Amino acid sequence: MASRVLSAYVSRLPAAFAPLPRVRMLAVARPLSTALCSAGTQTRLGPLQPALVLAQVPGRVTQLCRQYSDMPPLTLEGIQDRVLYVLKLYDKIDPEKLSVNSHFMKDLGLDSLDQVEIIMAMEDEFGFEIPDIDAEKLMCPQEIVDYIADKKDVYE
């Protein structure tokens, strides 16, 4: 029984390593260029999307691509909401005392280690590192909002 299974597997092995059929390339679209979607509408590719390759298949054109999901654009209001949300989840902050202009040490009674933990939470939330020199200056939620908006080029 085992020999039959092994021989069947070995007989199919050359087919598994056969070269793929050659396909003529029609176009290569670079990021930030306009391309046709499968629905037939034109879309604008974002900067995080890889190059798009169109291949000719008899009878129709097929789009071969990999697209990454993109976050909706940031706004000052959205940044502020996310900053306050992260701060409200921090166990040493009383959500009732928290406002956009609350000073971490004077108003909320936090120490420097708490401030470092807050900055680390903001780095995780927004996906980029805040240098220590800049982090030392961020002492209230509004300063964090302004800093993130400046780094992410968000202006209203």
Curated annotation (Swiss-Prot):
The keyword Mitochondrion applies. The modification O-(pantetheine 4'-phosphoryl)serine is found at S112. Transmembrane segments: none annotated. It is found in: Mitochondrion. GO terms for cellular component: mitochondrion; respiratory chain complex I. Residues 1-68 form a transit peptide. Carrier of the growing fatty acid chain in fatty acid biosynthesis. Accessory and non-catalytic subunit of the mitochondrial membrane respiratory chain NADH dehydrogenase (Complex I), which functions in the transfer of electrons from NADH to the respiratory chain. Accessory protein, of the core iron-sulfur cluster (ISC) assembly complex, that regulates, in association with LYRM4, the stability and the cysteine desulfurase activity of NFS1 and participates in the [2Fe-2S] clusters assembly on the scaffolding protein ISCU. This is Acyl carrier protein, mitochondrial. It comes from Pongo pygmaeus (Bornean orangutan). The gene is NDUFAB1.
